[in-house]
């Protein structure tokens, strides 16, 4: 995931490491007290999505239609392959946030991908496409960070590559761990519940620091890495390709996490005075770690959450939380407790470029991943790709925007059956 939270996959965003909470700006009139800025990522108590009615303005699909291409085609195919698996049915019907309202049944969600792909291929123009989509789909919009403003913060994540060893040796002294048998998670949502004791009761899991000092994970090491920061980054991302000393590759993915709270390392480093907010990036975090690894390791413990991993064959690397390959510029990660899996979304925001500065970004993307830091209706992570360039782009992705879900109207679900082979 990939660098993001963890899943999975979930994968995790670079800015889960690097971002700090927004700061309020002082008002111009001294006699007025400015309203405090509402931080991003607060959990909701109510609906996560609002269905746009006949009188509501609809988002334009023109720019996203023009930007369609091979990556969108591949991402659609990956979602279809997931819906082809019987296990996908357990995640539906999708409730609307914490309410009892249904957003989508499995039949609507799976047929929606088929319908979208067919209409995309058959439409002669953006206008024709918009008309046909609005005829058979309902458009739902994220409620945003306070349940009413409908603004979503879009960060970025990528697939990191690291060096490591299956055995502890030389410079490889920092482990990732397998999932412990006593970790309890919700079988449908994957939400961590804690640790099951011998008497059957469930209690909160140990913190990151407690796990490190107790040694209770000894013997559960999956792979050894060059630094504790490498291990931490993979935990935040939820997935990685790790090159062994003999040149072979090992692929690791999210296998669960503890129920302890997440706290961003970047925020901790700013609070501690190791970095300033205007110079906050993954590169600056790495630089600070090289100068004083002990200080940064101490701040890592403010993030009490701990992520566990499993090895997989890598044939579908980089895989998101659905177990299918995520696609650059066409896959997003969201909170799967409140948003439906596998379906088509419309993302309207801005995104960085290597040389031209930020640009408007309007794309159809498939919701195929999740992340440890992506835990609310106002947060989503855009998948930027693999390697160094993707890391730079992911590190610069921090822009608000709008997030829409295209949900097939129930009366059309039977008209768009899944293809036999998932493609």
Language model segments and positions:
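C-terminal soluble interaction/assembly domains
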Residues: 313-423
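Bacterial signal peptide processing site
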Residues: 29-32
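Secretory/export targeting leaders with adjacent low-complexity proregions
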Residues: 40-313, 320-324
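N-terminal secretory signal peptides that target proteins for export/translocation
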Residues: 1-8
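C-terminal motif of bacterial Sec signal peptides marking the signal peptidase cleavage site
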Residues: 24-27
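C-terminal segment of N-terminal export signals and the immediately downstream linker at the start
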Residues: 34-38
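Sec-dependent N-terminal signal peptides
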Residues: 8-19
